[in-house]
A protein has these predicted regions:
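Short, well-ordered alpha-helices that flank and scaffold nucleotide-derived cofactor binding pockets
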Residues: 25, 29, 48, 147, ...
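Phosphate-binding loop that captures ATP/GTP phosphates
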Residues: 33-34, 42-91
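P-loop NTP-binding site
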Residues: 204, 208, 218, 239-265
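Conserved Rossmann-like nucleotide-cofactor binding loop
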Residues: 42, 97, 161
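Cytosolic-facing regulatory segments adjacent to core modules
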Residues: 72, 81-82, 88-136
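C-terminal boundary of histidine-terminating zinc-finger modules
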Residues: 223-239
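Walker A/P-loop phosphate-binding motif and the immediately C-terminal alpha-helix
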Residues: 2-42
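Conserved catalytic-core segment of NTP-binding enzymes
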Residues: 113-215, 220-221
Length: 265
């Protein structure tokens, strides 16, 4: 069974793409087959972290949206490219061409697009997880992605605007009947050590905090040099994100069982 997950944040600069890329690799290390989709179509950047060049992407999501290629043309298997010993990672990237970005902003795309892509990946590539890396904020694209996904992972920094925005985002997702979990990212080290932080924040934002990622300067400086966890598997960041990956597997497995039992009645 394929689980679709949206990685989202209320504001930009919270580390969505960094988290998505590293999370995908860690899920693969746990034996999962993962597809990551750069749905930040107006400002794509996930390919940079994966070290995927424009020459490697013969076609993009933009081409598929406008019927210029087949679905198989836009799915890039980067398992060997990343030298992963287990699992699999597929990448679907967006165009960096200005004219393509302008076109999709002006014309948009079908509201069924997200679900269609997830279903194709499930049927043709047998993936365990489809992860959408979205554009920050509350906009039509985000809501379409949320409506098409099983679970949302909200990244939040520890400042007032982010806390308020994450609470609002979570409440909107609840109205759509969608489950959301929160990861606190770039948390000041002294604050991250507080054992009460997850429960205190959970009460404020009315959502479960499933992980804390302290701020590390080296994460920022490494962004354009590849997936951090692959180069630094023993780093505390990698260890913490691995715990989040395992927790996500537990949570989505529980949700799947609940759905199956409900459907069986």
């Amino acid at each position: 069974m394929t689980t679709t997950c949206v990685v989202h944040s209320y504001r930009g600069g919270t580390g969505k793409s960094t988290t998505t890329s590293n999370l995908s690799v860690l899920l693969a290390a746990l034996g999962k087959r993962v597809a990551t989709i750069d749905m930040d179509i107006t400002s794509p950047g996930l390919h940079v972290i994966y070290n995927v060049s424009s020459q490697m992407m013969n076609f993009t999501l933009n081409d598929y949206i406008y019927n210029r290629c087949s679905f198989q043309d836009i799915v890039l298997d980067i398992t060997n490219h990343l030298k992963l010993p287990r699992g699999a990672v597929y990448f679907l990237g967006s165009s960096m061409k200005p004219e393509e970005i302008v076109k999709v902003i002006r014309e948009g795309y079908s509201d069924k697009f997200f679900r269609h892509v997830a279903e194709k990946l499930s049927q043709e590539y047998n993936v365990d997880y489809v992860i959408f890396d979205t554009h920050p904020g509350l906009n039509e694209d985000t809501l379409l992605a949320v409506m098409s996904s099983d679970v949302s992972l909200l990244l939040m920094r520890m400042d007032k605007q982010d806390v308020t925005g994450t609470y609002i985002t979570g409440q909107i997702m609840k109205k759509f009947g969608r489950i959301s979990y929160v990861v606190l990212n770039m948390v000041p080290p002294n604050l991250a050590e507080s054992p009460d932080l997850p429960s205190e924040v959970s009460k404020i934002i009315d959502a479960s905090v499933i992980g804390i990622l302290p701020f590390y300067e080296e994460i920022l400086s490494h962004r354009s040099r590849g997936v951090f966890c692959l180069h630094h598997p023993q780093h505390p960041y990698s260890s913490q994100l691995l715990k989040i990956a395992k927790r996500l597997i537990e949570l989505t497995a529980t949700e799947s069982q609940t759905i199956d039992l409900t459907g069986a009645k």
